[in-house]
Regions:
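Short, glycine-biased loop/turn motifs at secondary-structure junctions and
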Residues: 1-158
Length: 158
């Protein structure tokens, strides 16, 4: 796939682990980072995603940046790579991401018999309930493992 140079800028999302890029450079709002070289998805260039949910799967940390990408660019299914990426704004989104994760879990809570403490934590985000919810989740995981062991033993070839 050949990179295309486009005068059009694309707004995208990028996550970092703290206020530093993977190469150790500080993440500076307002700065345009440039890459000199061939762009190749997953290998070289400055990466970002058009949708934040796609960017999350590549996120090394909780700091989210809204970026504007330009220069030579390649578009993939869930990310892009470019030679110019300007940081428009950035902040530590841990609270937002935790809230989003709890809402996603609540969307499917009806699919299992969740312990009440887990449901309460997911609904409230109360950090005091978090350790208890984790313990209840671990107990449920252990029970599921016992069930799986039993089923695998019963279903094994004889």
């Amino acid at each position: 796939m050949k990179p295309m140079t486009d005068s059009r800028k694309i707004r995208a999302w990028h996550f970092t682990d703290g206020m530093f890029l993977r190469d150790g450079q500080p993440l500076v709002v307002g700065k345009t980072y440039t890459y000199a070289g061939w762009v190749k998805l997953c290998e070289s260039g400055l990466h970002a995603s058009k949708r934040p949910i796609d960017a999350l799967q590549y996120a090394p940390g909780n700091v989210v940046s809204r970026v504007e990408c330009g220069g030579e660019m390649l578009n993939g299914d869930d990310k892009l790579v470019c030679t110019e990426r300007t940081v428009l704004w950035a902040y530590d989104a841990e609270k937002v991401l935790r809230h989003f994760a709890r809402l996603c879990a609540l969307d499917v809570i009806h699919l299992w018999d969740a312990p009440e403490i887990v449901v309460q934590y997911l609904r409230t985000g109360d950090e005091d309930m978090r350790a208890a919810a984790r313990g209840a989740g671990a107990a449920a995981w252990d029970a599921q493992n016992k069930r799986l062991v039993r089923m695998l033993r019963e279903g094994r070839p004889r």
